[in-house]
Amino acid sequence: MKLTTTLLLSSSILLVHCSADKAEKVDKVDKVEEAAKAETRPYVVLCFDVEDYTSPESAGMDDIPKWLAETMSEMGATGSFFVIGEKARSLEARGRRDVIEAMARHDVGSHTNFGSIHPTVTETLEHAAFDEGVETMLDNEGAGFDDLERIFGQRPAALARHGGSYGPQLVAALSKMGAAYVYSPVSLPGHNAVWFANTLNFHGEGDFGFFDDAYHDDALFDPMLAALDEKIPAGTRGLDVVAFFANHPSKVRSIEFWDFNYYKGANPGPDEWKTPELRPLESMETARRNFRRLVEYLQSRDDIELTTYRAMVERFGRQPDTIDTARLAEIARRILDEGEVVIDPDYSPAETFAALAAALAAYAVEGLVPGEMECRRPFGPLQRPPREPGVAEVTGAEALELAGRADAAIAVDGHLPRALSLEVGEIGAGSLLALFSQAYLDVVEGSVADSYAVVPFDPHPTENEAAIVEEVRNCQEWPVHREDLDMTDLVEMTRLQMWTLKPAVAR
């Protein structure tokens, strides 16, 4: 009996021990799976474009961003409010500290300084030279940033495109302002977060959201909310950062956009502003309740991570400061193997071009290739490089001379050279990139060759070009713009700045 009891007790202990081990292993597997899921789930930013500065205070538009912000604060959620400078100044002039303080508990960014007032950003930049446009944007949008910081107590971490207000000069100006660009027309496959014009860009507004005209009516809102079960997985799959456009606060109440006042280039003064038709005030209670339901729904999903663009700037805003011999050689081989201006995951084509030129220039003087170099970030060329070179072949000495001239031009101008000339003809930036790649690989392995063929090469990177150009051209269709707005120069400038394009990596 004693032996039987002992055996039973031992068996029980063994079973308990095995069960505990099994439970511990299952728990570890669950935690690993949860961690892996968290690693792959996309970041989603709840966005609000706070715009209407034309409607009178009596229309109640100012109250809507307040209750949107308060609702999120109550729920422990957050988002990014992009505020037009003129709207912020309007709230300040009306004494609406309550609205300002409610939004200031969240991320506040710029939605351009003057919004739909003509000339818009695009109209201002329509025919502006690159550097001229950058300086204009630094003045105009820098002043808007200053006002937003003074009013909300936080410096904008990003500026979000307002309607069709775009220009690569604006994006480049933001690089000098230390801010990101949101709702950008620029992206790469699988990457909504990219570097373009030396600025962190976040593409698009997502393929969902836009509940503006549905919040006030359950019959409209309910099917849109239910559709998110399929739309969110489909619209976020394989992406890094996605904008969920919550609403234009004023459009929650108004039936038409407030800036119909400015359509087709019209520029009325305050005495001529018309108030858009409004939904009944009592419908705003339904709108507020449905907005809460939307936030609850988004919070309940375990396949996305709600965040802000300010947090995303921190997450994606770091990039390598140096490049070493092995990495540069790897990119040079890709350029030659693929026969195109390649976009590396860590280094833009402009950064690669600058590094190759600097390395060869150093070799020409010192006889050695630097083991590691500081990463320089020039802008793309100011004019389209020729695809066909005017020179069929150069000597090794000429290749090193061209590299030295390119290196000096970048240092002085801050741009890649469009082309460099020899006595018999000129060589475009793409062909120079290929030439420098081959010469660099040779000097890394021993010495420069006696001569090099100069090959035709694309004038800029072409990855995702068609999609980017289409989005830029579509900016002309914004109803606020003049009907004769010409996007030709801005499209071309965007193509040339694709030399600065690369994925942004979470670090």
Question: Residue spans of the language-model regions?
Answer:
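C-terminal domain-boundary segment and adjacent tail
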Residues: 73-76, 182-189, 249-333
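C-terminal motif of bacterial Sec signal peptides marking the signal peptidase cleavage site
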Residues: 16-17
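Metal-dependent polysaccharide deacetylase catalytic core of the NodB/CE4 family, i.e.
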Residues: 77-169, 189-193, 242-249, 274, ...
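The substrate-binding groove and active-site-proximal loops of carbohydrate-active enzymes
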Residues: 49-59, 82-87, 126-136, 155-162, ...
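Sec-dependent signal peptide recognition
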Residues: 1-9
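Active-site-adjacent pocket scaffolds in enzyme catalytic domains
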Residues: 117, 154-261
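Active-site beta->alpha N-cap acidic-glycine motif
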Residues: 36-104, 242-245, 250-252, 260, ...
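Ser/Thr-rich, Pro/Gly/Ala-heavy low-complexity intrinsically disordered linkers and tails
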Residues: 1, 21-37
